[in-house]
């Protein structure tokens, strides 16, 4: 899948495994140099002090190597010697070598050398060495076969080492070694017996193959990249550990190492072959719901609990998609009984704490993050902003609440009330925020002159909208040179002087989540041909470039002809690193929109 001579390497995508905190990435500045880190703290590999250079040793000296990685293991080879690293979901990874050794050398990404190390020491029972790395946790090093050396060098009077190096070396008689490195916070986690290394590699591959079964087949021509996308999601999937009460899916492993609340529902949408897992994925953030207000929290990491703030009420949109594709039998009566109060409280939070003061359920946002579109031109006139794209999410959430109520044992009588509220809010949005060409956001009753793609996001309401609005939205989205580019829909009109392809998210670049939302919406509205065409443009480009979040459609700005701003890598922004968010958006389009 990834490697020195493969189509994609590990410069933009990091190598990881479901349920493992360890990742491996190739150094952008020193090509061919692999680096090992963990995502306990959520710190980016660009800045983390906890990064180890991985060096292949021949006769005890580092040599240049090539590498290949698949879900089973990552293998490095040079001059007849090879070393493989296999990750596990049991808080350790294994290293196996033949005619070569392996060195892990601590080197901060911020120029702090080995500062992350608080001490390296042999354990009294003789089982191995332990390293204390402060907020990054601990590592336990054990030679199963072969040998290893631990080297720490301190400057005179220094409290932290200048050098931390662990060398795993082959047995002199066999030329082989087998080792384990455990990754944990405070105390070594029980792991059982070490299995045969090749058995572990096959188990990893099987785990990935089983995970892939939750997805429908990709449309013809998209199968190869769909496998990469599935691997991306699988490798970002946590186990229940640290702050995570259940498995979550991280945005990225090496860059943005956090679980975002609305992204959990994005990840659920393409899981059409296992809707019960999709339902669990949608419900997972309700584990941390504020019982007093009903608010769902913001992002969280392994070591940091959910943050304040919030993201959009995306759960209704995700459920609406699942209901259209597979029905609602995956929600049992017991599920509905348990989740109705939680979903209802989430909907009421928006109406109570973000009410626009217009005498109804209309809401006004206080932050762009509440729409999901962090730098969107919808919000250029300030706040509070009545934003139809967020209102559309709330409408679908209300309908989902109604449906869950109907399936419950005790709340079925609430179904009609929620549907009435959803319908009234839909009509109010159409009456007040459709200007004949687009939906508009408003600040203090005045329309915001924005050319954001988000103006058309209410198409997610599908056939709840009048046909003339559906037709107009489809027309606007399929007119070349406005939002439609050769590679999909740009997040800001190409005619807008606010469009930028530099360090931006949704102010010009062609972004996966927006393209997915709009194509799913067009499909729901009966515009399958238009949805198919846009999705193919986006996914065809992903096939060529890899699973990054946003692409620059051109190298110049159409509104003035000037050279476009550039993103300078490496960085965690949408134009560089691979992410599960781009992967799940791609998977939704190639399994549920294209050719359907």
Can you name each region flagged by the protein language model?
Residues 218-256, 281-302, 355-385, 424-510, ...:
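Extended glycan-interaction surfaces of carbohydrate-active proteins
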Residues 257-288, 454-466, 515-528, 538:
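Alpha-helical support elements that line or immediately flank enzyme active sites
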Residues 269-273, 317-327, 396-407, 460-463, ...:
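Short glycine/serine- and small hydrophobic-enriched flexible loop segments
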Residues 1-221, 273, 524-525, 576-582, ...:
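Terminal accessory carbohydrate-recognition/targeting modules of carbohydrate-active enzymes
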Residues 227, 265, 276-279, 283, ...:
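A structural signal for well-ordered alpha-helical segments within the folded catalytic domains
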Residues 200, 204, 221-228, 274-287, ...:
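Extended, well-ordered alpha-helical scaffold segments
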Residues 166-194, 253, 297-314, 328-331, ...:
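The feature captures the catalytic groove of carbohydrate-active enzymes
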Residues 162-164, 253, 265-266:
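Short alpha-helical segments and helix-capping/turn motifs at coil-helix boundaries
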């Amino acid at each position: 899948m990834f490697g020195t001579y493969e189509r994609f390497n590990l410069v933009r995508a990091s190598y990881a495994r479901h349920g493992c905190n360890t990742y491996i990435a190739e150094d952008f500045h020193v090509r061919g140099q692999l680096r090992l880190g963990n995502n306990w703290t959520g710190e980016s590999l660009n800045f983390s002090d906890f990064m180890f250079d991985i060096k292949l040793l021949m006769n005890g000296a580092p040599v240049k190597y090539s590498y290949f990685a698949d879900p089973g293991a990552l293998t490095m080879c040079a001059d007849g010697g090879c070393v493989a690293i296999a990750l596990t979901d049991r808080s350790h990874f294994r290293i196996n070598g033949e005619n070569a050794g392996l060195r892990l050398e601590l080197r901060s990404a911020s120029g702090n050398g080995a500062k992350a190390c608080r001490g390296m020491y042999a354990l009294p029972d003789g089982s191995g060495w332990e390293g204390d790395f402060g907020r990054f946790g601990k590592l336990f090093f054990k030679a199963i076969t072969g040998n290893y050396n631990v080297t720490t060098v301190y400057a005179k009077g220094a409290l932290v080492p200048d050098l931390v190096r662990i060398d795993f070396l082959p047995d002199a008689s066999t030329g082989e070694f087998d080792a384990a490195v455990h990754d944990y916070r405070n105390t070594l986690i029980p792991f059982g017996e070490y299995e045969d290394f090749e058995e572990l590699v096959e188990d990893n591959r099987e785990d990935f193959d089983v995970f892939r079964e939750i997805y429908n087949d990709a449309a013809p021509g998209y199968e190869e990249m769909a496998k990469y996308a599935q691997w991306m999601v699988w490798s970002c999937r946590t186990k229940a550990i640290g702050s995570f009460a259940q498995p979550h899916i991280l945005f990225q492993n090496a860059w943005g190492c956090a679980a975002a609340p609305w992204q959990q529902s994005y990840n659920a949408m393409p899981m059409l072959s296992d809707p019960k897992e999709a339902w669990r994925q949608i419900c997972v953030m309700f584990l941390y719901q504020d019982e007093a207000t009903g608010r769902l929290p913001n992002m969280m990491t392994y070591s940091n609990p959910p943050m304040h703030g919030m993201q959009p009420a995306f759960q209704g949109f995700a459920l609406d998609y699942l209901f259209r594709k597979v029905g609602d039998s995956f929600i049992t009566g017991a599920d509905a009984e348990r989740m109705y109060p939680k979903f209802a409280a989430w909907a009421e939070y928006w109406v109570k704490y973000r009410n626009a003061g217009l005498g109804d359920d209309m809401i006004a946002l206080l932050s762009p993050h509440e729409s999901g579109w962090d730098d969107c031109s919808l919000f250029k006139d300030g706040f509070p902003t009545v934003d139809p794209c967020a209102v559309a999410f709330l409408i679908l959430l209300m309908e989902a609440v109604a449906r869950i109520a109907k399936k419950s044992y005790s709340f079925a009588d609430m179904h009609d009330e929620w549907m009435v509220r959803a319908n009234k809010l839909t009509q109010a949005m159409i009456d007040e925020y459709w200007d004949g060409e687009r939906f508009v956001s408003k600040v203090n009753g005045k329309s915001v002159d924005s050319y954001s793609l988000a103006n058309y996001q209410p198409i997610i309401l599908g056939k709840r909208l009048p046909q003339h609005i559906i037709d107009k939205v489809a027309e606007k989205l399929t007119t070349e040179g406005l939002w439609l580019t050769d590679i999909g829909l740009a997040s800001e009109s190409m005619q807008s002087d606010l469009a930028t392809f530099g360090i931006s998210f949704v102010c010009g670049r062609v972004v996966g989540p927006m393209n997915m939302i709009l194509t799913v919406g067009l499909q729901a509205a009966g515009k399958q041909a238009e949805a198919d065409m846009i999705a193919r443009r986006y996914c065809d480009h992903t096939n060529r470039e890899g699973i990054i979040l946003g692409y620059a459609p051109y190298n110049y700005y159409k509104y003035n002809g000037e050279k476009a701003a550039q993103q300078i890598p490496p960085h965690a922004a949408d134009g560089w690193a691979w992410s599960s968010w781009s992967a799940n958006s791609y998977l939704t389009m190639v399994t549920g929109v294209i050719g359907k």
